[in-house]
Design a protein with these regions (language model features):
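Periplasmic alpha-helical coiled-coil/stalk elements that build and connect Gram-negative outer-membrane
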Residues: 2, 6, 34-38, 62, ...
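N-terminal signal peptide c-region/cleavage motif recognized by signal peptidases
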Residues: 21-23
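Outer-membrane beta-barrel architecture
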Residues: 65, 112, 274, 312-314
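Membrane-embedded beta-strand positions in outer-membrane beta-barrel channels/transporters
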Residues: 76, 110-112, 156, 308-312, ...
Length: 431
């Protein structure tokens, strides 16, 4: 019995120690905060548009493989049966020689293998065109994926702004509760009316309603961000406020749109070479074997097999009629891309200039906000003390508390706007 008692006691102590350690173990593994960089990475890897990269790779491989097969010998089978108005004959007779009469119905079934020579240039450029088209398509996807960064920035910093407003609204509630305590004390000593406390309580209810609205707004933003990045997020997910990025200059523009313009010009360059290839003479080797009547001996009226081979030259000069205009059209398209690129760079630099001006303005506002908060806080503390002794009204205190709250909210929003603008600036540059 004594042994059982000791054993049970030890089990109880072990269970108690385990329960005491559980909170500690939990506290040692906090849920990591969500970072802006991870949101960018998830949005770009999990968005449906990202699947187009793999599809482009597949189409590129198929197109290049099909184009490369143009270098293989071209096999052809054909047959014909003809009824002619005349046939080969010798218009004189030879003594002692009986020449056969060639039938006017003739038949031929043959197979031919052709190995192109000059067309190998066209094959090479068709392979290059497949790769160039795929590179241009990847650049288009890059442009669409890059636009996701601005959307992620908007939601991420929107949530941070809501959090700051909720934090400051909670601080406002604390100030109002402190004011209610001072007002109730003053009313208890007969130096203030009880309506002063009621006015503060009404203001407190309004602040709490504002917090409830902000919480609903946050849930909406978090749900939208979760859809965009393809992750399950809880309503109370924490966001890691990023540090202000290092300054970059407008000369460092690395937008994917610029790569798209270059890849499109590369496609035009390949098409220009293909246009030249199409108007060259075509030289090929060929071998043909068949069975027919007559075969190669036109004076033999029997069905026989035959074979022949050689080199073939053909040149379709009809393409030269439109060659110059087609070449000019490609040149116009290339110049159009240059104009579009210049216009894009101009618009981008204008956006960068506006963003840099906005960031400088926000830095000045944040500096002045700090001084405004210091003065508003001093006035509020003085009004709180006066409220307790009945020398200030509840409305006065509410006015000063709200003024300080607006100043703190203004500074918090200006800081977030500065951070948001800095990351938008990097996104505009192509980071």
């Amino acid at each position: 019995m004594h042994t059982l008692y000791i054993y049970a006691t030890r089990r109880l102590w072990a269970a108690a120690l385990l329960l005491l350690c559980l909170p500690t173990l939990t506290a040692q593994e906090p849920v990591p905060a969500l970072s802006l960089d991870s949101c960018h990475a998830w949005a770009q890897s999990r968005h449906p548009t990202a699947k187009r990269y793999a599809l482009t790779d597949q189409s590129e491989a198929d197109a290049a493989s099909n184009a490369a097969k143009g270098a293989l010998p071209q096999l052809m089978m054909a047959g014909q049966a003809t009824l002619q108005s005349a046939s080969t004959h010798i218009p004189f007779t030879l003594p002692g020689i009986d020449l056969p009469e060639i039938a006017k119905d003739q038949y031929r079934l043959y197979a031919e293998a052709v190995q192109p020579l000059t067309d190998l240039l066209t094959v090479r450029d068709n392979v290059r065109l497949a790769h160039a088209d795929a590179a241009a398509e990847r650049s288009r996807v890059d442009v669409e994926m890059h636009s996701l960064k601005a959307r992620v920035n908007s939601l991420f910093f929107g949530i941070l702004a809501v959090d700051e407003q909720a934090r400051l609204a909670a601080s406002l509630c604390d100030d109002l509760r402190a004011g209610i305590g001072r007002a109730d004390t003053a009313a208890a000593h007969g130096v203030a009316l009880r309506s002063a406390g009621d006015a503060l309580r009404a203001e407190l209810l309004g602040a709490e309603q504002r917090i409830a609205e902000l919480q609903a707004t946050r849930r909406t933003y978090v749900a939208t961000l979760a859809l965009l990045i393809g992750r399950k997020l809880t309503d109370d997910v924490r966001l890691d406020r990023p540090a202000e990025p290092s300054a970059m200059h407008a000369e460092e523009i690395r937008r994917p749109e610029l790569r798209l313009f270059e890849s499109q010009k590369a496609v035009l360059g390949v098409r220009r070479r293909l246009l030249t290839d199409a108007n060259l003479p075509h030289v090929s080797l060929f071998v043909q074997g068949g069975y027919g009547r007559p075969a190669l001996n036109m004076l033999d009226n029997d069905f026989k097999p035959y074979a022949l081979g050689g080199i073939r030259l053909s040149w379709n000069i009809a393409g030269l009629y439109t060659y110059r205009k087609q070449r000019h059209l490609l040149d116009v398209n290339a110049r159009t891309l240059d104009v579009q690129r210049d216009a894009f760079l101009l618009e981008t630099r204008m956006t960068l200039t506006r963003q840099e001006t906005e960031m400088e303005k926000l830095r000045r506002l944040v500096t002045s906000d700090a001084e405004i908060i210091r003065l508003r806080e001093r006035v509020k503390e003085s009004a709180r003390n006066q409220l307790q002794f009945g020398t200030a009204t509840a409305n006065d205190y509410i006015q000063y508390v709200n003024a300080e709250h607006r100043a703190r909210l203004s500074m918090a929003l200006h800081e977030l706007q500065l951070l948001w603008e800095a990351y938008n600036h990097r996104t505009t540059l192509g980071e």
